Amino acid sequence: MNQAAQTVATISAEALRQTARNTHALPEDARWRVDDVAALFALPFNDLLFRAQQVHRENFDANTVQLSTLLSIKTGGCEEDCGYCPQSAHHDAGVKAEKLMELDEVLEAARAAKANGATRFCMGAAWRSPKDRHLEPVMDMVREVKAMGLETCVTLGMLKAEQAQQLKDAGLDYYNHNLDTSPEFYGKIITTRTYQDRLDTIGHVRDAGINVCCGGIVGMGESREARAGLIAQLANMDPYPESVPINNLVQVEGTPLAGTEALDPFEFVRTIAVARITMPGAMVRLSAGREAMDEALQALCFMAGANSIFYGEKLLTTGNPQADRDRALLARLDIRAEGYAG
């Protein structure tokens, strides 16, 4: 472990779980109680998909998806110990720490993404939280990418209120900060950042007037109840996130979650469907893990209400289907890419 990683105080997993249970229990009058969400998960598969597709059609064109591209603008060396992440300095996953990319490199990637049909460009940096000196070059990236006509999103770790406002002033459209999992399961995955830390950052983003991109990861060994708990936390935000990425764990050798039993594919589709029903107006994004999904499974995810995919060869440090394969699949399903005449 490097010195940067050692500077972060580690909270015991049990303390995190206890705090999460006490602090983040949903009120009795919550819009979606965990039991209600769990009842959706328990519906017969066809009934659940039928209901999700109905909700989807009431809010979106069911045959259109948004293509998003995600670029790692600062890779590796992160001080956090997220058990799924190869970019953590706590894990020996073979990811080298790199410095922040230059503006010209980022703009070249953004131009290529737009030429390939993406209408949304996301930039991720492996920081616990950005230092103020890091923010100015990121704001330059946001301004220049936005000037290309692309929707902008960044994920930089925890933010202070004033940093969120600076990003808003730079024209940022979305800020991504995932909850990852339910409050109860959280301490088994991360011990260097509390659930409340995540909620505080989301609050700063919302207060600054930036759209919230917030979702989670499934397939980390959690129970169905934990998946229901994650969705309930998201759906009870006021308002719920405009953008909800659902990731299927990509297991990377050298991370603590390597070797975790894989999630049943139909359970992943159920998670997409439940997200669509509980957050009807959100963009539900089919995110990490798509490379391991066959075309039939991806088609079921679209039926369940997913209306965005991450597009390009890499998602931060993990693989993703080739753009040509994605275009061919969408064409076979008669699904149009938003804003792309291809």
From Swiss-Prot:
<dbReference type="GO" id="GO:0051537">
    <property type="term" value="F:2 iron, 2 sulfur cluster binding"/>
</dbReference>
<dbReference type="Pfam" id="PF06968">
    <property type="entry name" value="BATS"/>
</dbReference>
<dbReference type="InterPro" id="IPR013785">
    <property type="entry name" value="Aldolase_TIM"/>
</dbReference>
<feature type="binding site">
    <location>
        <position position="85"/>
    </location>
    <ligand>
        <name>[4Fe-4S] cluster</name>
    </ligand>
</feature>
<keyword id="KW-0479">Metal-binding</keyword>
<dbReference type="InterPro" id="IPR024177">
    <property type="entry name" value="Biotin_synthase"/>
</dbReference>
<keyword id="KW-0001">2Fe-2S</keyword>
<feature type="binding site">
    <location>
        <position position="122"/>
    </location>
    <ligand>
        <name>[2Fe-2S] cluster</name>
    </ligand>
</feature>
<comment type="function">
    <text>Catalyzes the conversion of dethiobiotin (DTB) to biotin by the insertion of a sulfur atom into dethiobiotin via a radical-based mechanism.</text>
</comment>
<dbReference type="InterPro" id="IPR010722">
    <property type="entry name" value="BATS_dom"/>
</dbReference>
<protein>
    <recommendedName>
        <fullName>Biotin synthase</fullName>
        <ecNumber>2.8.1.6</ecNumber>
    </recommendedName>
</protein>
<keyword id="KW-0411">Iron-sulfur</keyword>
<feature type="binding site">
    <location>
        <position position="285"/>
    </location>
    <ligand>
        <name>[2Fe-2S] cluster</name>
    </ligand>
</feature>
<dbReference type="GO" id="GO:0051539">
    <property type="term" value="F:4 iron, 4 sulfur cluster binding"/>
</dbReference>
<dbReference type="InterPro" id="IPR002684">
    <property type="entry name" value="Biotin_synth/BioAB"/>
</dbReference>
<keyword id="KW-0408">Iron</keyword>
<feature type="binding site">
    <location>
        <position position="78"/>
    </location>
    <ligand>
        <name>[4Fe-4S] cluster</name>
    </ligand>
</feature>
<feature type="binding site">
    <location>
        <position position="82"/>
    </location>
    <ligand>
        <name>[4Fe-4S] cluster</name>
    </ligand>
</feature>
<dbReference type="Pfam" id="PF04055">
    <property type="entry name" value="Radical_SAM"/>
</dbReference>
<dbReference type="GO" id="GO:0009102">
    <property type="term" value="P:biotin biosynthetic process"/>
</dbReference>
<feature type="domain" description="Radical SAM core">
    <location>
        <begin position="63"/>
        <end position="290"/>
    </location>
</feature>
<dbReference type="InterPro" id="IPR006638">
    <property type="entry name" value="Elp3/MiaA/NifB-like_rSAM"/>
</dbReference>
<dbReference type="GO" id="GO:0005506">
    <property type="term" value="F:iron ion binding"/>
</dbReference>
<keyword id="KW-0808">Transferase</keyword>
<dbReference type="InterPro" id="IPR007197">
    <property type="entry name" value="rSAM"/>
</dbReference>
<feature type="binding site">
    <location>
        <position position="213"/>
    </location>
    <ligand>
        <name>[2Fe-2S] cluster</name>
    </ligand>
</feature>
<keyword id="KW-0093">Biotin biosynthesis</keyword>
<dbReference type="GO" id="GO:0004076">
    <property type="term" value="F:biotin synthase activity"/>
</dbReference>
<keyword id="KW-0004">4Fe-4S</keyword>
<comment type="pathway">
    <text>Cofactor biosynthesis; biotin biosynthesis; biotin from 7,8-diaminononanoate: step 2/2.</text>
</comment>
<feature type="binding site">
    <location>
        <position position="153"/>
    </location>
    <ligand>
        <name>[2Fe-2S] cluster</name>
    </ligand>
</feature>
<comment type="subunit">
    <text>Homodimer.</text>
</comment>
<comment type="similarity">
    <text>Belongs to the radical SAM superfamily. Biotin synthase family.</text>
</comment>
<keyword id="KW-0949">S-adenosyl-L-methionine</keyword>
